[in-house]
Amino acid sequence: MHSIKRSLAVMGTIVALMALAPVASAGSHRAFHLDKTCAEDGSEPLGYICTVQHSDFKWIPAGTDIRYLSEDGNVVQASIEIRNGSTDGACTWSSDVDAICVFSAGTGRLTQFNLEVVVTANADQSVWYWDGTYWFGD
């Protein structure tokens, strides 16, 4: 009888820990940084495309394109497509060189991906910087 109660207690503990594991990992915010350059491209909706030159997030490596799809006032819709996934977001510009971009959800490897970054540029706007945090989950 005691061994059955002990087994049930152990199983209950395991189930409780398994239920809490996704919650713990979902809330884990991590630092994010990338550098990108942008070039004119008449085939793109807004006439330019940006390419990641360096990233400390392995799923958005150097060479990844960031596309800007539409704009409404100071808000520009953006899309990042990687091998086996994508995510969409919005960048709100406060000046020609300052913005905040927010991405959420996604597909494939970027399912439940969330990203919030501050966008800045170097003096001649040849390199753009994204600095902020990312996490997976709701």
Residue ranges and their predicted role:
Residues 11-19:
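Bacterial N-terminal signal peptides
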